[in-house]
Amino acid sequence: MKKILLFPGAFNPPHNGHAEAVETVLRKESFDELWIVPSGKRDDKTIATSYEDRRAMGNLFVEYLQSKINIPVKLITAELNNIDGKFTHEILKEIKSQPDIDVMQLIGSDGFLDLQKGKLIDSQEKFIVMNRNGYELPKNFSLNENRVIFDGTTQSISSTQIRNMVKNHDIGYKKLVPEKITSFIEGNRLYF
């Protein structure tokens, strides 16, 4: 059975904090493949960046990760292509139902808390929850074999912060984003 680390998110844009989260997990856990799953339509966020631009940045992020880690990395664009209104949890269930794969989902504590609130978590789903500043899990959070918490030293970066930095012409964002993605953002005038 192939062991997959599934990493869903907006990735608008992908940044060094995302890469660092993956590297932190892979130092402690082993997987056969990493699947990056950019989200499509969302109830909680408006995503103005086009499908084509997000897919292109996703491909650049896969290339960047592939240079840093020793397992294959795939970009899963099922949700970006989503025209029938399915949301992340529905598409992830379809992915996880594939035979011969064991899927563990990497998610920030903010996303996990949102899923819990919406009662979108099946007790059998496997998660690695990466603590994010400002979104600490409750002290009574129940751990089991399907729930692993990482109190990693990942950078406290958000894609929203990066978009705002670009919009405000703060070149400090270039230290937070892989170089080829920075070039893509500038070349396509994203977030300006």
Stretches found by the model and what they are:
Residues 1-192:
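Nucleotidyltransferase catalytic core that binds NTPs
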